[in-house]
Amino acid sequence: MTHQTHAYHMVNPSPWPLTGALSALLMTSGLIMWFHFNSTILLMLGLTTNMLTMYQWWRDIIRESTFQGHHTPTVQKGLRYGMILFIISEVLFFTGFFWAFYHSSLAPTPELGGCWPPTGIHPLNPLEVPLLNTSVLLASGVSITWAHHSLMEGNRNHMLQALFITIALGVYFTLLQASEYYEAPFTISDGVYGSTFFVATGFHGLHVIIGSTFLIVCFFRQLKFHFTSSHHFGFEAAAWYWHFVDVVWLFLYVSIYWWGS
């Protein structure tokens, strides 16, 4: 390894940003093909490419941070700023969906019957599955905080238990959301109500799946003793992301499920 006189990590050229971008293109194109032509070939190709990219990119980052020691305190500080900016960009992303929802619901057009929910739409009961989903995500927020505190105290077993509980709650939330979609009395094509409901809650569901994947990687890394009480930014970033997903759901629940019904 060459000697360097600074604390920054000079990253080697990597193909994964390109393959990740191509997999995103294949997945979005595949979704359109699935919706309009009932063909899942392109979607499956995109998902496979995405999974391979994730595996190999994570492998490289783990190698650079844990085994080669490139993630110095200075690099970790930069990564923290990067994660904060990423979460801010996600906040703005969801702001667009809330804007669309409130724009449509606060002044419903005569075409919708001048009321919200629009005439003919039977909204979901906010005190049934949505309320259960809310309690599941709030419980997962408690368990991820327990995992973080256990890691800071060097209690490995408690950290693994709490992380496993968080992942299980995340998977349970996803299954509940899928069953709710399956049984919903309206579809994404049912006007502006269906569009705003499924796009906002669907993107949140996608973020829960991403967060769960992030936490599963952290779980396997912890099994291999990758984290210490002073060096665990991978887990910290996952915890921040999970709390963000939690807060977004609270806004979705209050706005779309409770007030919007």
From Swiss-Prot:
UniProt GO BP: mitochondrial electron transport, cytochrome c to oxygen; respiratory chain complex IV assembly
Matches recorded under InterPro entries: Cyt_c/ubiquinol_Oxase_su3 (IPR024791), Cyt_c_oxase_su3_dom (IPR033945), Cyt_c_oxidase-like_su3 (IPR000298), Cyt_c_oxidase_su3-like_sf (IPR035973), Cyt_c_oxidase_su3_a-hlx (IPR013833)
Pfam families reported for this sequence: COX3 (PF00510)
Statement: the UniProt record of this protein carries the keyword Transmembrane helix: yes
Keywords for the protein's UniProt record, in alphabetical order: Membrane, Mitochondrion, Mitochondrion inner membrane, Translocase, Transmembrane, Transmembrane helix
Function of the molecule: Component of the cytochrome c oxidase, the last enzyme in the mitochondrial electron transport chain which drives oxidative phosphorylation. The respiratory chain contains 3 multisubunit complexes succinate dehydrogenase (complex II, CII), ubiquinol-cytochrome c oxidoreductase (cytochrome b-c1 complex, complex III, CIII) and cytochrome c oxidase (complex IV, CIV), that cooperate to transfer electrons derived from NADH and succinate to molecular oxygen, creating an electrochemical gradient over the inner membrane that drives transmembrane transport and the ATP synthase.
Protein name: Cytochrome c oxidase subunit 3
Organism of origin: Aepyceros melampus (Impala)
Native organism taxonomy: Eukaryota, Metazoa, Chordata, Craniata, Vertebrata
Gene coding for it: MT-CO3
